[in-house]
Curated annotation (Swiss-Prot):
Annotated keywords: Cell cycle, Cell division, Coiled coil, Cytoplasm, Cytoskeleton, Septation
Domain BAR: 17-237
PROSITE patterns recorded: BAR
Record-linked InterPro entries: AH/BAR_dom_sf (IPR027267), BAR_dom (IPR004148), BIN3/RVS161-like (IPR046982), Rvs161/Hob3_BAR (IPR037429)
Name assigned to this protein: Protein hob3
The gene coding this protein: hob3
GO molecular function, one term: cytoskeletal protein-membrane anchor activity
Amino acid sequence: MSWHGFKKAVNRAGTSVMMKTGHVERTVDREFETEERRYRTMESAAKKLQKEAKGYLDALRAMTASQTRIANTIDAFYGDAGSKDGVSAYYRQVVEDLDADTVKELDGPFRTTVLDPISRFCSYFPDINAAITKRNHKLLDHDAMRAKVQKLVDKPSNDTTKLPRTEKEAAMAKEVYETLNNQLVSELPQLIALRVPYLDPSFEALVKIQLRFCREGYEKMAQVQQYFDNSVREDYSNGLLDDKVEQVLQSMRDLSIAGLNNSQ
């Protein structure tokens, strides 16, 4: 920060303190405050959307990676028994394809049509925030100069040129502030209104990507069903699968090895 900038920062800090103590009257612009609140709400929502969009892509990768680990474990658990009908090996192959093909094929389109546009939208916020900060600084300058003019009016200086000179500086400060303020009051609503048409294509792309992932996942998993006995699907549909599982558990409990610990 330059020396000139440092002095301005100190003067503005002093003006803020004097406003709090009632020595300098603060300009209140309800219209700007309303538009700034609306902008802050949109900024917060957009940043959250950016975070969640990235999280969605990470979650897809994590889910398919977890499926792959489960499939490998199931295949190892089945061992030779699974090789008889091939169900565990086929299931492993299906989830590996889902991870290797479907998710990786969706990665590029998701970034191009969803994540990158949202990130570009959010990239404008630092410039807008800088403009708002500059406007607030110019408002402090305007209020400070107005207070100086009023002080000279209430208590005239021996230097007769001081009041006209200060009034000129105050008019310039007011013009700079009002130019920035009017620009923000005019353009912030336009930015907020543009958010929907800008993000609509990304929203549509997100739905299509989700649809493709779910459809291809369903189609691949549905193929695994052909390896299961028809009676298993019928028992599941008729609510009889729990009984069948209980029968298997009872058979396990009936094994002599299961009762060795109780016999000691």
